[in-house]
Regions:
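Charged, low-complexity, helix-prone segments enriched in Lys/Glu/Asp/Gln
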Residues: 7, 40-48, 75, 93
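Acidic, aromatic-enriched beta-alpha/helix-loop junctions
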Residues: 25-63
Length: 124
């Protein structure tokens, strides 16, 4: 979809969601995802040996979805969907695989390594 259209945009680092934006014309709404997503991204960057800004910037992408209904509600609905769809274990596996969903099944991860991913839990 062209920028400036009515859409919900999911900002991704590789295959890990980072943020949800919605826009209708000039009106915009931004929803920050929970901290577990940022912690998974940080861990995936370390696993993938991404240390420079240039390397990091090349990994970001956006997914455009049609805007259905109210701007704020649509953004929050997508953020809630992502939060429920990406469990701590799924994010941990993604982080361990360097952020690529396609590599998750090919990456052997032990139960101990999964337990070490408790840092992805939110402290609420």
């Amino acid at each position: 979809m062209p920028r400036g259209s009515n859409e919900v945009i999911v900002i991704m680092w590789r295959d890990i969601p980072a943020q949800v934006n919605a826009q209708a014309g000039r009106e915009r709404k931004q929803v920050q995802l929970s901290d577990k997503f940022q912690r998974a991204i940080d861990r995936a960057k370390r696993k993938a040996h991404i240390y420079t800004a240039d390397e990091d910037i090349a990994q970001w992408r956006r997914i455009s979805l049609p805007l259905v209904g109210d701007l704020a509600e649509a953004a929050q609905r997508e953020a809630d969907r992502l939060d429920s769809e990406y469990s701590r274990e799924r994010l941990g596996r993604l982080a361990f695989a360097g952020g690529y969903e396609a590599d998750v099944d090919n990456t052997a991860i032990s139960a101990d390594a999964l337990l070490a991913l408790e840092e992805l839990e939110e402290n609420e």
